[in-house]
């Protein structure tokens, strides 16, 4: 393949205003799809009702304690290639805080194809879990994965944040929030979670520091009057708040 002169022009060294050498400029990042703005646009469909990307299903496995989940994922849903590190950390942290025991009500907000709610439901079959998402493709996958893994204690519902369950209250609400949907959506999840928790109910959030953990922590503390970092690993933080 013959490179055009314009390509080599883009590879010439660049210097910022303060004289710091810049090897790769924005045009190169754009050419290879690595610009953060482009990545944000690419990921925005995860919180759309109807993803406009072509379906391409695949199967993955996820092991938690003595439970093995076989999951179908697809293009247009979050973390289609594997259960992401943040969700895995949230699942393990929650199960450490709350080993299998008496029946509790749990909401999994932004459930995607279902790893969080299904893993907890499989390990703790006495709990009643409501899984919520706005993405119809993700919801269909979650239903398929529920059936395939015989997790009978979960209900899957279409919902923008927690709007569909405004008549219910929960003991625990868990979320790996859709960061790319924007701060307004993420903060709305926190606000509605506060309203939908029982007194002494608990909110669990996984979020990366570089993707807004400090502002999320501040917002949650404003709502709940308390927030605690109960786990952190590889830049991911688990925030916990208790409704007083």
Give, region by region, the residue ranges found by the protein language model.
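Conserved beta-strand signature within the Rossmann-like core of class I S-adenosyl-L-methionine
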Residues: 200-207
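Core SAM-dependent methyltransferase catalytic element
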Residues: 232-244
